[in-house]
């Protein structure tokens, strides 16, 4: 599949394009985010939002969710066939927050999905612009990754909660396409496959008949996506075994969990993209910026530059720390939930703290929360430096994969060591190396044992000044090697519940 010389850049996946050169890619990504911006401006006009209200991230999220819901064909069809009390399948809406007499009030709005689709298409030159929708999904997914923990989901599928760094993109909808698949972590793919296998074990007809044939195709496709994320021959060979299994069952689940654990050290390649809230693109378009003409990239300086001069606000609950709220959104914007805090802090220019120390809850406000006491503050989304986003796991060289901390999946291509607790990880690999995958298992364990925490990843890669848009002078930071930085240590975040 992906390895047969058909690798496309993320931007091509993101824009659904075939092979393009760099300029064409920049233009089509620019067209995509420009369309999001135009749509947002139009929605603000429809809803009569003031400039301040239009810059409120909660309003942006509501508007984004409305357009995603309007284009969710599968769910729309389901809602029409299974009418539930009090849900109009043809309408979509959510909370819009307005400033009235020095207070914030919540207003629930309802719109025809058809109308939302019309506004979206009109903003995107009459096209469906699926790429823009996927982009919004990835932004929501990145926000969830930074906000919630998935301990319960991990435990339910028989995985270890310490594998949280493999769970990027775990809340992405199935319909997020190639761009969505690129940003999913190894753990996310493993979890989707395990759920599928478990259904097959419990439901005899799952793999049978015409439906079963389609299920099987989906299963093999997911296996191939996961295989493409692994960078060592032994891990890939094990994925072939899982994919070719006649009747996937507990043996395959075992193999998948083994592979997920191995990815803590032999890291998979997972793409990272800076996807920003719709209001940010809206602000830029409103100020006369032409994204398509200027070109745009999700993995270079552009998102940093955009955030340098965008002012976005957020509602803040009475006992929340606005600086912490800003950190949460900054991490989401740069897809940095699983990045080493030392690297994030250096790039951001202010200390990024582990989630257990944040005094803030999620960005979205529940419908039963009291608005009387809500305040709003400016989100500080600027950075000191910028760095290129990576799609590799940071293994030091292709075959002999390097050290991986029990909870880092690098976002930025910046030189550092990837400290990890080998004892903690290796403890999970006691015993079981028999069965048909025994030689691969042995090989994988051997590679893991040879990994050294002091090895340097992304050799020679550095961060850049914001004035250095051509990335000519890398500044290679030096980090305190002993002090590893996981965002998830001492975690007390809420669970993600759909």
Swiss-Prot record:
Keywords: Capsid protein, Helical capsid protein, Host nucleus, Host-virus interaction, Ribonucleoprotein, RNA-binding, Viral nucleoprotein, Viral penetration into host nucleus, Virion, Virus entry into host cell. GO terms for cellular component: helical viral capsid; host cell; host cell nucleus; ribonucleoprotein complex; viral nucleocapsid. A motif (Bipartite nuclear localization signal) lies at residues 198-216. It is found in: Virion; Host nucleus. A motif (Unconventional nuclear localization signal) lies at residues 1-18. GO terms for molecular function: RNA binding; structural molecule activity. Late in virus-infected cells, may be cleaved from a 56-kDa protein to a 53-kDa protein by a cellular caspase. This cleavage might be a marker for the onset of apoptosis in infected cells or have a specific function in virus host interaction. Residues 1-21 are annotated as: Disordered. One of its GO terms (biological process) is symbiont entry into host cell. The keyword Glycosyltransferase does not apply. Encapsidates the negative strand viral RNA, protecting it from nucleases. The encapsidated genomic RNA is termed the ribonucleoprotein (RNP) and serves as template for transcription and replication. The RNP needs to be localized in the host nucleus to start an infectious cycle, but is too large to diffuse through the nuclear pore complex. NP comprises at least 2 nuclear localization signals that are responsible for the active RNP import into the nucleus through cellular importin alpha/beta pathway. Homomultimerizes to form the nucleocapsid. May bind host exportin-1/XPO1. Binds to viral genomic RNA. Protein-RNA contacts are mediated by a combination of electrostatic interactions between positively charged residues and the phosphate backbone and planar interactions between aromatic side chains and bases. Belongs to the influenza viruses nucleoprotein family. This is Nucleoprotein. The gene is NP.
């Amino acid at each position: 599949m992906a390895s047969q010389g058909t690798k496309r850049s993320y931007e091509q996946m993101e824009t659904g394009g075939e092979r393009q050169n760099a300029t064409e890619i920049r233009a089509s990504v620019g067209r995509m985010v420009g369309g999001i911006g135009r749509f947002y401006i139009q929605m603000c006009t429809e809803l009569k939002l003031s400039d301040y209200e239009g810059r409120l991230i909660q309003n942006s999220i509501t508007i984004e969710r409305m357009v995603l819901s309007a284009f969710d064909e599968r769910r729309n069809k389901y809602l029409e066939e299974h009418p539930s009390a009090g849900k109009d399948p043809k309408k979509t809406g959510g909370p819009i927050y307005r400033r009235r007499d020095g207070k914030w009030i919540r207003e629930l709005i309802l719109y025809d999905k058809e109308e939302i689709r019309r506004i979206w298409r009109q903003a995107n030159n009459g096209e469906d612009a699926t790429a823009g929708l996927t982009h919004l999904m990835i932004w929501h997914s990145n926000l969830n990754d930074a906000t919630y923990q998935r301990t319960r989901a991990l435990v339910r599928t028989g995985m270890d909660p310490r594998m949280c760094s493999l769970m990027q993109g775990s809340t992405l909808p199935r319909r997020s396409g190639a761009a969505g698949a690129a940003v999913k972590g190894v753990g996310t793919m493993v979890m989707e496959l395990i759920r599928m296998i478990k259904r097959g074990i419990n439901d005899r007809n799952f793999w049978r008949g015409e439906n079963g044939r389609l299920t099987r195709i989906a299963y093999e496709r997911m296996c191939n996506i996961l295989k493409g994320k692994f960078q060592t021959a032994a891990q890939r060979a094990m994925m072939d075994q899982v994919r070719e299994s006649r009747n996937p069952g507990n043996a395959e689940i075992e193999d998948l969990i083994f592979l997920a654990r191995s990815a803590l050290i032999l890291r998979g390649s997972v793409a990272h993209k800076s996807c920003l809230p719709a209001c940010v693109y809206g602000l830029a378009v409103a100020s006369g910026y032409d994204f398509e003409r200027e070109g745009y990239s999700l993995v270079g300086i552009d998102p940093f530059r955009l955030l340098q001069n965008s002012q976005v606000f957020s509602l803040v609950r009475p006992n929340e720390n606005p600086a912490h709220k800003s950190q949460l959104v900054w991490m989401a914007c740069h897809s940095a939930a699983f990045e080493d805090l030392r690297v994030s802090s250096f790039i951001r220019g202010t200390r990024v703290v582990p989630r257990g120390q944040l005094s803030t809850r999620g960005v979205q406000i529940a419908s039963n929360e009291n608005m009387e006491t809500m305040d709003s503050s400016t989100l500080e989304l600027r950075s000191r430096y910028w760095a290129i986003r990576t799609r590799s796991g940071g293994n030091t060289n292709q075959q002999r994969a390097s050290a991986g901390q029990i909870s880092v999946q690098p976002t930025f291509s910046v030189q550092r060591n990837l400290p990890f607790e080998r004892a903690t990880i290796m403890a999970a690999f006691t015993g079981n190396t028999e069965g048909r995958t025994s030689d691969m298992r042995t090989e994988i364990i051997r590679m893991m044992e040879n990994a050294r925490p002091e090895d340097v990843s992304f050799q020679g890669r550095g961060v850049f000044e914001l004035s250095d848009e051509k990335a000519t002078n890398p500044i290679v930071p030096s980090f305190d090697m002993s002090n590893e930085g996981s965002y998830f240590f001492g975690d007390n975040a809420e669970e993600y519940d759909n």
